[in-house]
């Protein structure tokens, strides 16, 4: 039964890629100062023939089980660039990024660079967002991968600061252009003194090292307003827009 399940999962995963079922969902990121859209985070989704939408977690789980995470990582990156260009999503484009999925930074970079060049996308507008929990196993490798991307003009964000004790170590080693403050700190920010103190210090620290901060996972205006007061540069969350596939964005 286990072998049968693995075989079925493999067929399902191959169909996702071959049949054009993979798509992006884009969530706005807004300036804290005026609430205007500064860019979008590209999130991976899959649209099944019956119309149901699969989350990134479901897709990634299958990719890991089948040892296809590298293939998926490259495909997701190209897809985000192509859809952002096709649907004229202006501003910064944040693309989730898994350094551990990359064996050869130079080859991977060349693929991404070629797509950006073909689409005439300014690499300075593309931000590769390192998911901290995905990258804790090899700090040196992550730094090497990101250094290669920076040399071509791409920028780097560190995601989920505040979700693990090692976050400050990664902040020091990777020196990101943007830092995302985890929803564990932003949820209930207006009501919890301790969270406000931590977010204020993180915002100050990031300013000192030249990184701009994004409060993610915001669910109400009260928390968003406090984040602005504490010096956060950008806001992301449901008050400013849910993740939407391109067709939904065109209809809204």
Model-assigned labels for residue ranges:
Residues 70-141:
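Catalytic core of bacterial c-di-GMP phosphodiesterases, primarily the EAL and HD-GYP domains
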